[in-house]
Amino acid sequence: MIASLDELYHSELFFLPVMDENARLVGLEIIATFAAEDGAVRMPTELVAPRLSVEEQYCLFVEKLALLETCQHFFIQHKLIAWLNLPPAISDLLLLDSELFSRAARFPFLELAINENYPGLNQGKNNETLANLAMHFPLMLANFGAGEASTKAIFDGLFKRVMLDKNFIQQRAEMISFEPFMHAIVAQISSSCESLMIAGIDTEAMFARAAPLGFSAFQGGLWPPVPVSQLIKLVQR
């Protein structure tokens, strides 16, 4: 996809691994970076996304679905989950556009990731769009703890999985209360979702601290993103 910012950028897609407590692959999040045409500048999606038009967000979402289609047998064979971030601007389109809906719904292993800044998230199941999405697709709250939402949508059972925000984790990790605080979150949230995951695991030391705390999966710089050509290496370790 080509994005028109201060100059032209093209999207490049990668797979960000999610591991279990034994460092075995359980799923992959499809993420995008944006590179300038000359390749000199690269930017992550979170910096570019606020500047993308609805049409560009739609194209990026479709591009991710197309990539997923090319490697769906890999996900099925290895019983892996795929996560795609769903921008708020695409939520209604996904429910209203039958072709787009069918393209997403055809993957039984696909789950949609929602961020805390999703409009009306604090309404929980009273948010009609969010409730309808949860009826048709497994949802993951991708950055719980970012400080932009309450726990209502979680306790309303809208999310199959909850991922703790990487910045929240890295800030808390510096405190001596990290372990008991994480135990408290696990105790509070676990009964409201199928899986509680943690991001921000950038080192072996951090993985060793987080692994015994009751989380089902882990994501971070310890397992960097890979292009589609290197997917098979993730299951050969």
From Swiss-Prot:
Record annotation: effect of changing residue 29 to A: No effect on motility
GO BP, sorted A to Z: regulation of single-species biofilm formation
Alphabetical list of InterPro entries matching this protein: Cyclic-di-GMP_PDE-like, EAL_dom, EAL_sf
Record's note on what induces expression: Induced in nutrient-poor medium (at protein level).
Cellular compartments per GO CC: plasma membrane
Annotated EAL domain residues: 1-237
Assigned keywords, A-Z: Repressor, Transcription, Transcription regulation, Virulence
Entry keyword Phosphoprotein: no
GO molecular function ontology, one term from the record: cyclic-guanylate-specific phosphodiesterase activity
Record's keyword annotation contains Transcription: yes
Domain of life of the organism encoding this protein: Bacteria
Family: Belongs to the YdiV family.
Function field: Acts as an anti-FlhC(2)FlhD(4) factor by binding to FlhD, decreasing its ability to bind DNA, and thus negatively regulates expression of flagellar class II operons, decreasing motility in nutrient-poor medium. Required for resistance to host phagocyte oxidase. Suppresses killing of macrophages, while promoting resistance to hydrogen peroxide. Data regarding c-di-GMP is controversial; suppresses bacterial c-di-GMP levels but neither synthesizes nor degrades c-di-GMP.
Note: The multicellular rdar morphotype is characterized by the expression of the adhesive extracellular matrix components cellulose and curli fimbriae.
UniProt-recorded name of the protein: Anti-FlhC(2)FlhD(4) factor YdiV
